[in-house]
Amino acid sequence: MISLDYGKYKNARNASWQCILDFNVNKLPVIVTDIIKKSENIRLFKDSDVHMLEEGESGKTILHNGFFEIVYRDTEPSYRCRFTISHELGHIFLGHLLINTPVYRTFAIRDDLESSANVFARDLLAPACVLHELQATTAEQIAKICNISMQAAKHRAERMHVLEARNKYYLHPLERRVREQFDSFIKENKQ
């Protein structure tokens, strides 16, 4: 896997925070379809309806007639669909798309664009500051609270271990605002 330099990582992380704020996400698990419903130029399609995905693709995004169209493989488990949709939102919000050039989500592609979209999806679905406040740092806790796969939760738990050891939360103003936006949820669900 190609490592993602820190600048690109921060850009993806910050974009996920901005998405959380812009679309008023304030509880876990994040309902990614609500983000799409609130957006003016993003449409969501099930592959079982449009048959656009190739073998091995979990999702893709194309720009068509001024709309970003996300197609996802709806036969996969719901937590996988949510990650795929979030990943595709990452491509959109990070500006990865060119006119009429699709971006695909597969298991094989591991370049910087895909890594950035994965960071965006991870940070959207499992925001570290919220997990920190909930004291949810194990893969099991994260998978349950965030409705993500155990594989994704393990990756998040590994990153949480690093973040907890560093203990540098709330240095960025966007992160502080995300924490404030989740305040009621945190109070209701603190371990």
Where do the protein language model's features map onto the residues?
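Active-site hotspot residues in diverse enzymes, especially metal/ion-binding acidic/histidine motifs
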Residues: 1-191
